[in-house]
Amino acid sequence: MVSIRLARGGAKKRPFYHVVVAESRSKRDGRYIERVGFFNPIARGQEERLRLDESRIAYWIGTGAKPSDRVVSLIKEFKKQQQV
């Protein structure tokens, strides 16, 4: 089963996440099919906190990929951010 989830990057105590489409059996930070965005939870000032490729996410959800709970909330946040 294909899922849309977060893959952790960054340094110790400085997390940075890539939003990836991956096979659900793959390791958290392992092999992925496509990277569709990023999430920086500790962004400060003018740094970009969240970027998603909505068209690719819609495509993958249409093909049956299941987004994780956190990714669903990030998608909602991104759409809200786009409206402002």
Swiss-Prot record:
Keyword Lipid metabolism attached: no
Top-level taxon: Bacteria
Gene Ontology terms: biological process: translation
Keyword line: Ribonucleoprotein, Ribosomal protein
Gene Ontology CC entries for this record: cytoplasm; small ribosomal subunit
GO molecular function: structural constituent of ribosome
InterPro entries named in the record: Ribosomal_bS16, Ribosomal_bS16_CS, Ribosomal_bS16_dom_sf
PROSITE patterns: RIBOSOMAL_S16
Keyword Ribonucleoprotein belongs to the record: yes
Family stated for the protein in its record: Belongs to the bacterial ribosomal protein bS16 family.
NCBIfam families per record: S16 (TIGR00002)
PANTHER family linked: 30S RIBOSOMAL PROTEIN S16 (PTHR12919), SMALL RIBOSOMAL SUBUNIT PROTEIN BS16M (PTHR12919:SF20)
Name by which UniProt lists this protein: Small ribosomal subunit protein bS16
Upper lineage: Bacteria, Pseudomonadati, Pseudomonadota, Gammaproteobacteria, Methylococcales
Gene field: rpsP
